[in-house]
């Protein structure tokens, strides 16, 4: 009986050690963090933030790239990544409302102005009646684009629509423009479509075909835009030291200089 009891004690101790070891392996390294970014120009900027985070804080950053605006928040919500850096607050607010995400801003990055681009006309004076205008179809960037068209005098929106007007809120359209909603990643390619005369494109996607607002835009969003981009965390990790350090790294002169270069002066500090 004594031998049997001793064996059980030893076995229990070994099992406990294995459980503890397993728990230790599952614990997150406090000096490592996964950050979701959009492939392309924003990824280039984030690479500099990654280096600054390592050099200044000893933080190991793994960048996880995405090709659209939907999956980075989904991955963050699931816990596949720890942060993302690609969106402005109106977009995040809409995503939280639509999908009940427990996400929150952790810090500001840059304002990336949207602009109107065309391969068919050189100025808005050349825009013909009935022209087709491509716009992003997600609610916040659609609203942002419609407000920009209104500012150019191309349409008039119903009063009181705030930052989220839709095409149904257009009350005046003197040129009879046909407003075509597309997925944001499709907008750069739409410029080669014979049917599309003008496209309003976010700087992130415009930069993928080497377009910049200041040089190539027929009209550009003001730099005092409310659409400042943000770094986003979950509510359960927003106060972690790693999150704070990555935000500080992103808000460095080194990262601003890279963004200014990559976007040809199209990036404006949001902090």
State each model region's role.
Residues 24-26:
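Bacterial signal peptide processing site
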Residues 40, 67-69, 79, 83-93, ...:
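Beta->alpha turn/N-cap motifs
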Residues 63-74, 161-189:
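Short helix-initiation/N-cap motifs at beta->coil->alpha
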Residues 107-118, 143-150, 207-271:
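Periplasmic-binding protein-like
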């Amino acid at each position: 009986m004594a031998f049997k009891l001793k064996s059980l004690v030893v076995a229990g101790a070994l099992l406990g050690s294995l459980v503890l070891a397993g728990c230790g392996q599952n614990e997150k390294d406090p000096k490592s963090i996964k950050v979701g970014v959009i492939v392309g120009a924003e990824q280039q900027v984030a690479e500099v933030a990654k280096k600054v985070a390592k050099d200044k804080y000893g933080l190991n950053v793994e960048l996880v790239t995405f090709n659209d605006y939907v999956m980075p928040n989904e991955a963050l919500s699931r816990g596949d990544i720890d942060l993302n850096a690609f969106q402005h607050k109106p977009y995040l607010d809409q995503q939280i409302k639509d999908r009940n995400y427990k996400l929150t801003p952790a810090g500001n990055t840059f304002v990336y102005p949207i602009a109107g681009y065309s391969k068919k006309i050189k100025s808005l004076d050349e825009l013909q009646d009935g022209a087709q205008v491509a716009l992003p179809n997600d609610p916040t960037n659609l609203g942002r684009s419609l407000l920009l068209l209104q500012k150019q005098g191309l349409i008039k929106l119903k009063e009181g629509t705030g930052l989220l007007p839709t095409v149904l809120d257009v009350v005046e359209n003197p040129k009879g423009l046909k407003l075509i909603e597309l997925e944001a990643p499709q907008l750069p390619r739409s410029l080669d479509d014979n049917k599309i005369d003008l496209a309003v494109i976010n700087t992130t996607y415009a930069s993928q075909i080497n377009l910049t607002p200041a040089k190539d835009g027929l009209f550009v969003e003001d730099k005092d835009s409310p659409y400042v981009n943000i770094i986003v965390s979950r509510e359960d990790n927003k106060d972690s030291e790693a999150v704070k350090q990555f935000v500080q790294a992103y808000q460095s002169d080194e990262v601003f200089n890279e963004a200014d270069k990559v976007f040809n002066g199209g990036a404006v500090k949001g902090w």
